[in-house]
């Protein structure tokens, strides 16, 4: 089974890949110019990696939770992904990613976002054990 996790933001989309529920790694983030361009890039990743499960982070709590959830679900609908989609709580994943100390927070290159997606996918499969 191959899974892809997405940490969807307004400017960047963090991406992580998991193979056989064991090997996970962050991929390069998708920098959003517009939603169609970003959706096409994600569609390409879904196809190239033969993804059967899409894990998508949803923010829980906070003042903009409802609006961000609506935007994220709309973006996911643009992917036209016909396999399993699992929405998970992404709360605290960016903070955990910062604790890894790998991503430079001053750069807006998406490494932090992809580390957050990596944490989501790792936590998802750990919760199934």
From Swiss-Prot:
**Keyword match Cytoplasm:** yes
First-level EC class: hydrolase
| SUPFAM superfamilies for this protein | Ribonuclease H-like
One of the Pfam families matching this protein, by short name? RuvX
The record's annotation in InterPro entries points to: RNaseH-like_sf (IPR012337), YqgF (IPR005227), YqgF/RNaseH-like_dom (IPR006641), YqgF/RNaseH-like_dom_sf (IPR037027)
**Entry EC number(s):** 3.1.-.-
Give compartment(s).
Cytoplasm
* UniProt keyword Cytoplasm present: yes
One GO location term (cellular component): cytosol
Its function? Could be a nuclease involved in processing of the 5'-end of pre-16S rRNA.
Identify this protein by name: Putative pre-16S rRNA nuclease
Organism, per UniProt? Answer: Campylobacter jejuni subsp. doylei (strain ATCC BAA-1458 / RM4099 / 269.97)
């Amino acid at each position: 089974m191959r899974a892809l996790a997405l940490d969807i933001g307004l400017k960047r989309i963090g991406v992580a890949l998991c193979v056989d529920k064991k090997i996970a790694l962050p991929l390069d983030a998708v920098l959003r110019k517009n939603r169609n361009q970003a959706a096409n890039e994600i569609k390409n990743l879904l196809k190239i990696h033969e993804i059967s499960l899409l894990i998508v982070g949803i923010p829980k709590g906070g003042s903009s939770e409802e609006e961000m959830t609506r935007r994220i679900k709309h973006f996911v609908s643009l992917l036209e992904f016909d396999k399993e989609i699992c929405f998970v709580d992404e709360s605290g994943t960016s903070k955990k990613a910062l604790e890894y100390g790998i991503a430079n927070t001053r750069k807006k290159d998406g490494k932090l976002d992809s580390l957050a997606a990596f944490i989501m996918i790792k936590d998802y499969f750990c919760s199934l054990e």
